[in-house]
């Protein structure tokens, strides 16, 4: 009787040992599979990275392949959202258009002389003072020369404003001042202050600039658009009047076809 009980007890112990060994093997196998899966994910992510990003991985989590990929995906989404934003695109287009309009050449140019050199002077009443480009100032040799070192060479330095600048407009010599700007074109710009002091008038029918009783021919560089920008006709104490075909016939003026039907600023009638 005791021998049978001992045999059954031994059989139960051996069965428990087998079950324990099976559980241990299953646990080890599961850990091994998880480790292999993690290594496979890291290896698969590392294949997407360039070689220079794999040289210094170290132990930091930010430098691991999956962290680098996640960070690049977030940056790419931000760039894509910014690129698809209509507000941002409108701001970019507005900035580009303002930049191109700032460097746009005016419609009326006159030829004059300064320092025995020919200049192309732009007529623009949108600016109060005269303006001269830094490149034109260097070409005329009007830049101040200051020493770079106590015993060194001298180099031209453009001032912020030029006084007593003599311009030969037709048969008249005009002494005026001009502000120095970093714009290459136009070389020189006649502002509203000089135009009013000299009592200059712009004749659209004759395409000429009239100081006093002397006519100076101008050069028109616009094609099929408006002949004169709005700023050229914006004079103080003016009233707004819409020009029609009947008004043009009564005035006897010839206007470019692209300018008809638009509003311009005209001096008040007496």
Curated annotation (Swiss-Prot):
It comes from the Eukaryota. Down-regulates transcriptional activation by nuclear receptors, such as NR1F2. This is Nuclear receptor-interacting protein 2. One of its GO terms (molecular function) is aspartic-type endopeptidase activity. Its main location: nucleus. Residues 61-99 are annotated as: Interaction with NR1F2. Interacts with NR1F2, RARA and THRB in a ligand-dependent manner. Keywords: Nucleus, Transcription, Transcription regulation. A motif (LXXLL motif) lies at residues 192-196. GO terms for cellular component: cytoplasm; nucleus. Disulfide bonds: none annotated. Residues 1-33 are annotated as: Disordered. Residues 1-27 have a biased composition (Basic and acidic residues). It is found in: Nucleus. One of its GO terms (biological process) is proteolysis. InterPro entries: Peptidase_aspartic_dom_sf. Expression is restricted to the central nervous system (neurons in the dentate gyrus of the hippocampus, the amygdala, thalamic and hypothalamic regions). SUPFAM superfamilies: Acid proteases (SSF50630).
């Amino acid at each position: 009787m005791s021998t049978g009980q001992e045999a059954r007890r031994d059989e139960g112990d051996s069965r428990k040992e087998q079950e324990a060994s099976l559980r241990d093997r299953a646990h080890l196998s599961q850990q091994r599979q998880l480790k292999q899966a993690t290594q496979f994910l890291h290896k698969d992510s590392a294949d997407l990275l360039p070689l220079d990003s794999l040289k210094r991985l170290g132990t930091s989590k930010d430098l691991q392949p999956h962290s680098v990929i996640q960070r690049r995906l977030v940056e790419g989404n931000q760039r894509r959202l910014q690129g698809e934003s209509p507000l941002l695109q409108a701001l970019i287009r507005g900035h580009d258009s303002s930049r191109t309009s700032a460097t746009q050449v005016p419609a009326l140019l006159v030829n004059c002389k300064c320092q025995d050199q020919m200049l192309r002077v732009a007529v623009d009443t949108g600016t109060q003072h005269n303006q001269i480009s830094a490149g034109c100032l260097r070409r005329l040799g009007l830049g101040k020369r200051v020493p770079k070192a106590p015993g060194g060479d001298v180099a031209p330095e453009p001032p912020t404003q030029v006084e007593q600048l003599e311009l030969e407009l037709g048969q008249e010599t005009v002494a005026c001042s001009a502000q120095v700007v970093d714009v290459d074109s136009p070389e020189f710009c006649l502002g509203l202050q000089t135009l009013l002091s000299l009592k200059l008038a712009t004749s659209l029918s004759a395409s000429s600039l009239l100081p006093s009783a002397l006519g100076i021919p101008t050069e028109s560089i616009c094609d099929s658009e408006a002949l004169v920008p709005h700023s050229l006709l914006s004079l103080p104490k003016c009233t707004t009047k819409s020009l029609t075909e009947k008004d043009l016939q009564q005035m006897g003026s010839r206007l470019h076809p692209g300018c008809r039907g638009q509003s311009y600023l005209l001096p008040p009638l007496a």
